[in-house]
């Protein structure tokens, strides 16, 4: 007997459509203004660090695609109880990473690239486990690309260095606002 599910088909079509349209207009349906500002700053940091506009655009586009796909999966109730526990764990790790990044940005001489890189790597691993059965290997590659890029000790060291002070300040302001509003 053939198993057919219109809900599954609709979800698959929605993910496919959104993956093709991961531009600003679609992103604003899922990503608020503060998050958008943080993403813009992360783009600028990536562009300055890599000296490559296309590479910086690719990493932010991958981040947006993954965020939208995970939001769609969550909104459609695609996660089972064990996956919801993983989603909670991911959110806690992401929140811990944001608070650590803020702390490093606010207290001089406390920055440790290995600590922040480790937290981002843990976030990546939990997210990959969460979406293992829901997203394609290509999407898994996007997750790895995003987290590997931002957990690069060289990039983190540059971000907390003197050349990126203005960017770090804006990122910290955005993270603080997202934490205060309970969005992170």
From Swiss-Prot:
Record keywords: Cytoplasm, Immunity, Innate immunity, Lysosome, Nucleus, Phosphoprotein, Ubl conjugation
BP GO annotations: innate immune response; negative regulation of inflammatory response; negative regulation of T cell activation; regulation of apoptotic process; T cell activation
Pfam families assigned to the protein according to its UniProt record, in alphabetical order: DUF758
Cellular component annotations (GO), alphabetically ordered: cytoplasm; lysosome; nucleus
Protein name in the entry: Tumor necrosis factor alpha-induced protein 8-like protein 2
Family indicated by similarity: Belongs to the TNFAIP8 family. TNFAIP8L2 subfamily.
Species whose genome carries this gene: Homo sapiens (Human)
Phosphoserine modification, residue list: 3
Tissue: Expressed in T-cells, B-cells, macrophages, neurons in the brain and brainstem, and stratified squamous epithelia of the esophagus, cervix and skin.
Domain notes: The central region was initially thought to constitute a DED (death effector) domain. However, 3D-structure data reveal a previously uncharacterized fold that is different from the predicted fold of a DED (death effector) domain. It consists of a large, hydrophobic central cavity that is poised for cofactor binding.
Purpose of the protein: Acts as a negative regulator of innate and adaptive immunity by maintaining immune homeostasis. Plays a regulatory role in the Toll-like signaling pathway by determining the strength of LPS-induced signaling and gene expression. Inhibits TCR-mediated T-cell activation and negatively regulate T-cell function to prevent hyperresponsiveness. Also inhibits autolysosome formation via negatively modulating MTOR activation by interacting with RAC1 and promoting the disassociation of the RAC1-MTOR complex.
InterPro entries hit by this protein: TNFAIP8-like, TNFAIP8_sf
PTM section of the record: Phosphorylated by TAK1/MAP3K7; this phosphorylation triggers association with BTRC and subsequent ubiquitination and degradation. Ubiquitinated in a BTRC-depdent manner; leading to degradation mediated through the proteasome pathway.
Subunit note: May interact with CASP8; however, such result is unclear since PubMed:19079267 could not reproduce the interaction with CASP8. Interacts with RAC1.
Cellular localisation: Cytoplasm; Nucleus; Lysosome
Database matches in PANTHER family: TUMOR NECROSIS FACTOR ALPHA-INDUCED PROTEIN 8-LIKE PROTEIN 2, TUMOR NECROSIS FACTOR INDUCED PROTEIN
